[in-house]
Amino acid sequence: MRIDLHTHSNRSDGTTSPADVVAQASEAGLDVVALTDHDTTRGWDDAADAARGVGIDVVRGIEISCRHRGISIHLLAYLPAPEGELFDEMERARESRVTRAERMVERLGRDVPITYEQVLAQAGPDATIGRPHIADALVANGVVPDRSTAFEHLLSNSGPYHVGHYAIDPVRAVTLVRAAGGVPVMAHPFADVRGRVVDDAVIEEMIDAGLLGLEAHHRDHTPEQVRHARDLARTHDLLVTGSSDYHGDGKPNRLGENTTEPDQYERLVALATSDVGVVRGR
């Protein structure tokens, strides 16, 4: 059984619809795929409907934007009930992203050709607006050749156009995911190629709050970082997952390039206590 537990659709910063993510996952030979868009569940229903048509199981999830002392942390939440404080926090994050995008485009527009309407045109229906959509508008306007160049030269956290956005504290996020009956797993915890990462002490605080897993197998981890994640998971009896972090054409990540072992997946599903079950398409 091949299992990919981290993908994005055009409901956040992916380029592919939820239904097409599911169809492509099936075509890639996956048996299980999780849809984990940033701070939104708006692709869940479409993904569930698609699963029943192509013979693949779908795990409904979210990737929650967190921040600890200025360091970005991503928390994957699997099978949480779509209500309550967790979802209030996600809506707050979504609204903050919109405000941030508007302000960044205003700053960029003083130097390069771009409007907020052009950014919206790059986003999917009900999408969580983010920097990738700004990058896509810059590409469409011929300012840069691709997303990577846009981030490197114009949209980085240290760049002159950067504006921050609200992100929940990771310990509180873990607590809210557990309260919603979900399974919290820290995404790519040691991927310093993406920017600064927290040390083990912060992860241990998250574990004390109820963190249940680490995404060890990810393209942004070095072999040493994979080993470190696995060792930490073993010490604390955490789940170990592997995933593609697929974004469609937005990133080079390919569906199924990293996967989760079946025993870890079965344990993850068993740990969920909400009524949000796996959508059985097989």
Give residue spans per PLM region.
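Short clusters of hydrophobic/aromatic residues that line enzyme substrate/ligand-binding pockets
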Residues: 255
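An N-terminally biased module of ancient metal coordination in phosphate/nucleic-acid-related enzymes
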Residues: 1-71, 155-156, 168, 174-175, ...
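Extended substrate/RNA-proximal surfaces in nucleic-acid metabolism proteins
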Residues: 50-207, 259, 263-282
